């Protein structure tokens, strides 16, 4: 039986945060809406909550971090999840460990990966991530393809005056590697919109999307968040470019069918909120966890509502003023 929240949104998938540690230091990382924490959920705890979620109709899992490949028990975790989930199991990763782990992850039951690559050239890559690993990420994409962790999605957070000029190269790279390129809007909470980093680097993607749409051979829709995906032709062949535009986007929230699980053992109803979290860590009784799961679903509500998109103009005005003062 699929559970539906009070806004008519079914919960069809889980986004499971395996840890909060990472070997990159991207300044815009939202850390899945959590803080750096200590002990993470054990494999058997993750298995238990997946088993319960599956009883409620969940059949799709996304593994995230931090950086999930830093967990030494990652293969075991994937195997445990696959016992219950017949749908898609995917993982978001920076890719550093993929050349080593790709085949074992596929064998364990992982279907595909999202690989974060926020710049095409080495200098910008290092400026964003704090590490000199651009070439290794290219190898990670190749390793994922060779292992069958496909289709690979390349996550690219668009940052004004930092990596926008590299989007054409990223599109060609995605086409060459038979990957899907996800152009992702830099997102934050309402309070975070006034931060220096956000005002400096946030860029609405509407004009960029129109440019891509004008070149598109066809368009698809990702049911999650109703995200548009354009098929365009490049020198390396056809490629899919998907736009992820969450900031002040009521339509994005209206199509959210995902419940999050934090590494500390909480059901998290929304990336942007922690006040509605429901803790299940330390509870072994499946009946009790099932009830907590129900509670979490009923606490879900859209973060962005109709009318919030209008205030985006105020945020843009602040950004323009700040950048003129540079």
UniProtKB/Swiss-Prot annotation:
Binds 2 [4Fe-4S] clusters. Binds 1 [4Fe-4S] cluster coordinated with 3 cysteines and an exchangeable S-adenosyl-L-methionine and 1 [4Fe-4S] cluster coordinated with 3 cysteines and the GTP-derived substrate. PROSITE patterns: MOAA_NIFB_PQQE, RADICAL_SAM. Pfam families: Fer4_12, Mob_synth_C, Radical_SAM. It catalyses: GTP + AH2 + S-adenosyl-L-methionine = (8S)-3',8-cyclo-7,8-dihydroguanosine 5'-triphosphate + 5'-deoxyadenosine + L-methionine + A + H(+). Its cofactor is [4Fe-4S] cluster. Coiled coil: none annotated. Residues 6-235 form the Radical SAM core domain. GO terms for molecular function: 4 iron, 4 sulfur cluster binding; cyclic pyranopterin monophosphate synthase activity; GTP 3',8'-cyclase activity; GTP binding; metal ion binding; S-adenosyl-L-methionine binding. The keyword NAD does not apply. [4Fe-4S] cluster 2 binds at residues 253, 256, 270. Keywords: 4Fe-4S, GTP-binding, Iron, Iron-sulfur, Lyase, Metal-binding, Molybdenum cofactor biosynthesis, Nucleotide-binding, S-adenosyl-L-methionine. InterPro entries: Aldolase_TIM (IPR013785), Elp3/MiaA/NifB-like_rSAM (IPR006638), MoaA_arc (IPR013485), MoaA_NifB_PqqE_Fe-S-bd_CS (IPR000385), MoaA_twitch (IPR010505), MoCo_biosynth_MoaA/MoaC (IPR050105), rSAM (IPR007197). Its EC number is 4.1.99.22. [4Fe-4S] cluster 1 binds at residues 22, 26, 29. Catalyzes the cyclization of GTP to (8S)-3',8-cyclo-7,8-dihydroguanosine 5'-triphosphate. Belongs to the radical SAM superfamily. MoaA family. HAMAP family: MoaA_A. This is Probable GTP 3',8-cyclase. The gene is moaA.
